[in-house]
C-alpha cells in the first residue's frame, strides 16, 4: 500500500513538472510543426520529417527516445541565430515513420547519416540529448561524416 501511494505521488510530481515546463516553453515559431521550413525526405525506405533554421555552420540537434522536434525548442530558439540548425524527428517518433518491428541505434544512426548526405553537408556539429547523444557518438565513431564538435 505504501509503495503504491509513493508511486502515485512520484507520478503526479512528474506530470506536474511536465505541465509546468510545457507552460513555460511558448515560442512564436511552431517548432516541430512549422510548414514553412519543415519537410519530409525518404531515407532508408522511411519518411523522415525535419526542419531547417538559420544560417552558418550546420548544427544537428538530435532528440532523445520518445521525444520529437518540439522537445528541442529551447535549443533551436537559442542556436538558430548562430548556426544552421537541422533538427528531425528520429525514426518512429514525432512525424517520422517507423516501418520496422524493432528499432536499433544503428538504424537511427543510418537515418541521420542519410539526412546529412541528403542535405549535402560537408562538416557538421552535433548536439544530442540522451539517445541523441548516443547517435552523435556513433556517427563520430563511424567517421562517415566530418564532425567538428
What feature does the model see in each segment?
Residues 2-59, 82-83:
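Alpha/beta-hydrolase fold catalytic core
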Residues 26-35, 39-40, 58, 65, ...:
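N-terminal non-catalytic accessory region
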Residues 35, 80-82, 121, 144-145:
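Short, well-ordered coil/turn elements that cap or connect secondary structure elements
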Residues 46-95:
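Conserved HGGG/HGGXW glycine-rich cap/lid loop of the alpha/beta-hydrolase fold
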Residues 87-127:
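Active-site loop/oxyanion-hole signature of alpha/beta-hydrolase fold enzymes
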Residues 122-149:
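Conserved hydrolase catalytic core segment
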Amino acid at each position: 500500500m505504501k509503495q503504491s501511494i509513493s508511486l502515485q505521488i512520484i507520478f503526479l510530481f512528474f506530470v506536474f513538472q511536465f505541465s509546468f515546463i510545457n507552460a513555460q516553453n511558448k515560442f512564436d515559431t511552431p517548432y516541430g510543426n512549422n510548414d514553412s521550413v519543415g519537410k519530409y525526405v525518404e531515407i532508408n525506405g522511411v519518411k523522415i520529417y525535419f526542419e531547417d533554421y538559420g544560417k552558418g555552420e550546420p548544427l544537428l540537434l538530435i532528440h532523445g527516445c520518445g521525444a520529437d522536434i518540439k522537445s528541442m525548442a529551447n535549443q533551436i530558439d537559442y542556436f538558430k541565430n548562430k548556426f544552421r540548425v537541422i533538427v528531425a524527428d528520429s525514426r518512429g517518433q514525432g512525424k517520422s515513420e517507423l516501418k520496422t518491428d524493432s528499432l536499433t541505434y544503428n538504424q537511427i544512426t543510418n537515418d541521420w547519416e542519410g539526412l546529412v548526405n541528403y542535405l549535402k553537408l560537408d562538416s557538421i556539429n552535433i548536439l544530442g540529448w540522451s539517445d541523441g547523444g548516443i547517435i552523435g557518438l556513433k556517427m563520430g565513431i563511424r567517421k562517415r561524416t566530418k564532425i567538428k564538435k
